[in-house]
Curated annotation (Swiss-Prot):
Pfam families: Ribosomal_L29. Keywords: Ribonucleoprotein, Ribosomal protein. The keyword Oxidoreductase does not apply. The keyword Ribonucleoprotein applies. InterPro entries: Ribosomal_protein_uL29, Ribosomal_uL29, Ribosomal_uL29_CS, Ribosomal_uL29_sf. This is Large ribosomal subunit protein uL29. It comes from Mycolicibacterium vanbaalenii (strain DSM 7251 / JCM 13017 / BCRC 16820 / KCTC 9966 / NRRL B-24157 / PYR-1).
Amino acid sequence: MAVGTTTGELRELTDEELTDKLRESKEELFNLRFQMATGQLANNRRLRVVRQEIARLYTVLRERELGLAAGPGGEDS
């Protein structure tokens, strides 16, 4: 997942793309935590960035679920 993906960019994605990105981010977070536990992680900041990215993804998905935001193209998903 790209570093610095904004919420606006995430809102332009479809639900399937969002769930794919969420899965990828969770896998990356798992790998980063494993590296941290074994002392191989050089960049601790990446953990925080990935957690924030996951939170943004959940926020966009929840907005759509509640009907607060439309899907890509202005249509409700």
